[in-house]
Amino acid sequence: MNIPNDPAILLSYINTKLRDDFPDLTELCKTLDVDQEALTKKLASIGYDYNKDLNRFM
């Protein structure tokens, strides 16, 4: 699936999907066929890390 390329827009998109549709990042990545490591690195590049307890990037 195509996901936003811009990191700031990607952050909003992923957090919304996590909040509304997925129990965790692993399920989101499997369902959307997204490389979890690449996604995590891209969002880390703008200062956001995944918090599994809150199921969101912060």
Regions found by a protein language model. Give the residues of each.
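Short, acidic, Ser/Thr-enriched surface-loop or helix-capping motifs
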Residues: 52
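Short alpha-helical "recognition helix" segments of helix-turn-helix
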Residues: 28-29
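N-terminal acidic leader/helix
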Residues: 1-20, 24
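Short acidic, Pro/Gly- and aromatic-enriched capping/linker segments at domain boundaries
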Residues: 34-49
